[in-house]
Amino acid sequence: MKATHNTLTHFSKKGNAFMARFLRRQRHQQLPQSLQILNPRRLFSPSRRAFRWLLITLTFIAVVPPVFFHFRLRHFHQMQLKKCDWLNDPPFVCAHGGDSINAFPNTMDAYRSAIHSQADCIEIDVSRSLDGVLFALHDRDLQQISGNSSSKVGHLSMKEIKGLGAAHRVDHKSNDQEIPTVEEALTFVSNSVTQVILDAKVGPPMYEKGLAKDILSVVQRTRCKNCLVWAKSDNLVRDIIRLSSDVTVGYIVMVDPKTGIRNNLLRIKKAKVVGVYHPLIDGKLVSILRRRNKKVYSWTVDDEDLMRKMLYEGIDAIVTSDPTSLRVVMQEVRTQCLEDGFSVQR
């Protein structure tokens, strides 16, 4: 009997609880729709998943843009440094044969025009005549003057070369279009520029024999303290190094026309300058040569876009046939860098 009473009591409690929940549900369903919407528990109790996504979104908005702009700013500074750092140590503007865009190469007119364009240095071609006189002349220029595509400076005597120069002067109606000797050229330009490059050409009939001695002799006679001698012939470069410790010497890096392979970058230890054919120049090459305390000169750069590229590579000198255009490009880049906020170190 007692067990039956307990069972009834249990069912009675469960029934009461069920009825209470039922009545609460009924009251809630009878609330106006507007009050149900404003129910605080519905309004302020988002699901955990929604809350998590909201938190992730807010974190993304707070963190990603500053990081993005930080890296963009860093990239901008790196690009600006690459583009503008040369302003702290500008390269020499080296006039190839003088201003050979506006005058015939290696003539007094070309040298005078280069000096007027504020070139820092002038490159003079050095070739030896049949009778051993050094002329400021390249074989290709002799061929143009003579009209003979096979002419070489070493095939002609001093008198013959001077005769061709006189005829060339008459054709151009200028007293400064004749062919100068290297001594005449050095006397004219060496005190007007920071550096003179003597680009020594090896040719018949004696080739390298005695050429280093002849070049050093004219350097000494003209007292050219700012002369740099370089050549494509490593034998000649080594001869000059062996005979004199006072003259700055360089060697040439280019692609061997026979093998298609670039010359060894570090092949002459005592040479202080390396003249590099401009398509070969990049940051890695410049870094390698700088680590060996060698200056990097590019040749021959006449295109304005390539001039800019050489500036960005931070080399020491740019050899060009058009020094005026190079000066204009340098000024344009300088102006843009300063407008972008680059600070030149003093």
Where are each of the predicted segments found?
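Phosphate-group recognition and catalysis centered on beta-loop-alpha active-site segments
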Residues: 2-346
